[in-house]
Each structure stands twice: as structure tokens, then as C-alpha cells.
Amino acid sequence: MSADHRLSARVPMTMGSEIPTDPTKNILMSRRPWGEFQQFVCNEEVTVKIITVQPGHRLSLQRHDHRGELWQVLDVPIDITVGDRKWTAARGESVWVPRGAVHRLGNPGRVPGRVLEIAFGRFDENDIHRLEDDYSR
């Protein structure tokens, strides 16, 4: 097998429904003749969403008791808050939000922005503790 077809080293992330420490360290990159792919999880119990944030909008400042989230910015730069850290993540950047961490996504741009979200742990939309919310929910 040529070097372009070999998979990069990977450490198993979780066993069963455990929440990983930081899965961004274990994203698998594989090059192929047609291009490449990134593998974020393998055979794990997860919930996967693509979140679209409209220009000038942001999600509530929130935390979760039962899940951690891995975010992958898909297109336009997205404002990120995780804990006390705030920054603008570029397309392709991976962000780990540990269980219990205060976090938020926002779109400072002029076009909709998308983020792939992979939630590890027990997923339930009721497991959202909103600390601030622009929409009074």
C-alpha cells in the first residue's frame, strides 16, 4: 500500500457510551487518489447534527450535564466560546466542548455558517442549561 493510502495513527477514543477526553486529538486523516477524508468517530454511540447559524445570530450560552460535543467548522468563520476562551474558528477547525463546559456558537459573517456537531454521551434536547439567550427561551 502506498504512503498516500495509509491511515494516520489513531488511538481508540471511547468504549461504549463513555465521553472522550478530547476527540480532536484522534481525528483520522486518510489520503486517497481522489482526495482525502477525515474520520471523526468509528463505531461509537453519538448524535450527529449540522447546525446552520444565520448571519449576525448566535446560539444561547449553554452547558450540558450528559454530553460533550465535537464541532467542525464547515464553511465560514464562526465565533466560538468554550469556558473562558473566545475566538473565531476558521473553516476546517475542530473544537472540543467537554461535558459541563459553558459554550456558544455565533456567526459574525454575512452568509449562513455551518458547523458539524458530534455529541458524545446521552443526547437529549432537554439537557440544555441556558445561561444567556438572545431569544428569551
What are these model-derived regions, one by one?
Residues 4-5:
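Intrinsic-disorder-associated, low-complexity terminal segments enriched in Asp/Asn/His/Tyr and depleted
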Residues 63-65, 73, 107-110:
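Short glycine/proline-enriched turns and hinge-like loops at secondary-structure junctions
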Residues 84-102:
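Short acidic-glycine-tyrosine-enriched beta hairpin
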Residues 25-68:
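A short glycine-rich, His/Asp/Glu-containing loop-to-beta-strand
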Residues 66-79, 83:
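Glycine- and acidic-residue-biased ligand/ion/polar-headgroup-sensing regions
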Residues 17-31, 104-137:
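Double-stranded beta-helix
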